[in-house]
Amino acid sequence: MMKKWIPSLAAGAVLTMNASICAAAVPSSALVAGGIEYGASADYVRQVYGTPTEVETKHHTLWNGEVTEYEYGDSFELKFVDGYARHIEISRHNGINTAAGIEVGSTLDAVKAAYGEPDKIRGDKYIYYCDEDKSIGLVFEIENNRVDEIEMGYLG
């Protein structure tokens, strides 16, 4: 009896291993945009990029407190909660890219070569969850097979 289910168990283990190898979740070390890591301090961002073009602080129910937004020009925005970067958005080709070198204007093929198949596609958004925390990750908005916008950090 035992000999009959051992091959099934082995086949199931192989299938499970293959499924996890194919997962596209990214490590937290991939959550970097423009040299700024998820969780970087606002002070560090100012050291790297200087004084923001605009600073706005407002109450945000999601984070149950104040959120401070830094804008650099009209295409690079960072949101800080308690002084730490929780969301970065790049909305135009401005030389700012991810740790894997993806920037606005990169091809969808380049995104997939860097990160694999997305964990989820929602409309024109290709979503890659962080393997340690599914509430954070990378989102690439794709228009005409090119990256039109990049979001990094909290995905809510």
What positions do the PLM features span?
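Hydrophobic transmembrane alpha-helix bundles
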Residues: H93-G101, Y126
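Membrane-targeting and insertion segments and their boundary/processing signals
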Residues: A11, V81-A85, E89
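Sec-dependent N-terminal signal peptides of Gram-positive bacterial secreted proteins and lipoproteins
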Residues: M2-A24
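Short, solvent-exposed aromatic-acidic interface loops
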Residues: I90-N94, E151-G156
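Detector for Asparagine
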Residues: N18, N64, N94-N97, N144-N145
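Acidic/histidine-rich, surface-exposed loop or edge segments in extracytoplasmic proteins
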Residues: A24-L31, R86-I96
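Short, surface-exposed ligand-recognition loops at beta-strand->loop->(often short) alpha-helix junctions
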Residues: I36-Y38, A99-V104
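A cross-family detector of function-defining hotspots
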Residues: A25-V26, V32, A42-Y84, E103-L155
